[in-house]
């Protein structure tokens, strides 16, 4: 009986301490659609906050392009790099200011956290 109790307790502890599985939607797809709950699930499951898609976009690139400030704040709080460059050297800030003139709140947020454009990074060497 004592062995069964210890085994049960150990199983409960192991299950309770494991990471939850990521959702059935990619972190990039969740970012496109503003699905903050799926993003949170990905991060809790250990998905890389700076995971790149086929063209080198991170989730932060996606939300900067789509105007998802709340998700941008979450990703930055979880350690997302604000200066990761994708294809053509584009950073999340490039996407917030060049292609979407109404993304000033996200551009300001990125700047507050050290965000730079690809051209600024290139000039720094």
Predicted regions and their residues:
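Ankyrin repeat domain, specifically the short helix-to-loop turn at the C-terminus of the second helix
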Residues: 40-48, 73-81, 108-116
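Positively charged n-region of N-terminal signal peptides that target proteins for export
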Residues: 1-4
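C-terminal motif of bacterial Sec signal peptides marking the signal peptidase cleavage site
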Residues: 15-16
